[in-house]
Amino acid sequence: MPTVSMRDMLQAGVHFGHQTRYWNPKMGKYIFGARNKIHIINLEHTVPAFNEALAIVKQLGSQKKKVLFVGTKRAAQKSIKEQAERSNMPFVSHRWLGGMLTNYKTIRASIRRYRELETQSQDGTFEKLTKKEALVRTRIMEKLEKSIGGIKDMGGLPDALFIIDVEHERIAIQEANKLGIPVIGVVDTNSDPAGVDYVIPGNDDAIRAIKLYATAVADACIEGAADSASVPNKDEFVEEKAADAE
């Protein structure tokens, strides 16, 4: 199972929190102290919390369940998109659309529209249109790609959310909470951990730290999926048993 060590976290700067004046008292138990008016996160809490989260993600992957990667702030966008795609998981790396979970019916209609436009752009339909109409459709498609391209293959609500910066993604957390979808979240010293089922106390601004989290979660998804592929399904097992009996 993929695990992340304290050394990995130190090298990525996971232990650096926010300025002491911006702290959230609810994060007090995860703070080791302060240096140069910056809170230092106690990695003795972070390491086991993150590795527990990875075990849960791996289990979800082995059950062919979907983990939605969410990170829409600039520092998180690249890692979230790359690692979600690598692990064949859905993602939101631009703006979170209100109702993305709680009003999934409407989102599904937008996904259908996006797929139609995608097909039209590939099958020559756009070439038969006027330049103006083709441009209008291309712009709509690009806009949809940005907002829902990462969830077009999700096929329904996700089974868990993995979030970078819970303060920035508060709407996503509220929607997940309403629907009983578990939330795994990286929570910095300035954030409120309320609504996060699996709190990972850590730096949510440093690109290296974000890459570390996203890569490890993607690795756990991939390992889980590999475990799932290596376990024969019940029908195959019954067939093999019958063949042996003959």
Curated annotation (Swiss-Prot):
What SUPFAM superfamilies is this protein classified in? Ribosomal protein S2
For biological process, the GO terms are:
translation
Per the UniProt record, the source organism is Saccharophagus degradans (strain 2-40 / ATCC 43961 / DSM 17024)
Write out the similarity annotation.
Belongs to the universal ribosomal protein uS2 family.
Q: Provide the organism lineage as a comma list.
A: Bacteria, Pseudomonadati, Pseudomonadota, Gammaproteobacteria, Cellvibrionales
UniProt keyword list: Ribonucleoprotein, Ribosomal protein
Any GO molecular function: structural constituent of ribosome
Q: What is this protein called?
A: Small ribosomal subunit protein uS2
Q: Name one GO cellular component term.
A: cytosolic small ribosomal subunit
Q: Cross-referenced CDD domains, in alphabetical order?
A: RPS2
* NCBIfam families, A to Z: rpsB_bact (TIGR01011)
Q: Pfam family of this protein, just one?
A: Ribosomal_S2
Q: Which InterPro entries match?
A: Ribosomal_uS2, Ribosomal_uS2_bac/mit/plastid, Ribosomal_uS2_CS, Ribosomal_uS2_flav_dom_sf
Gene behind this protein: rpsB
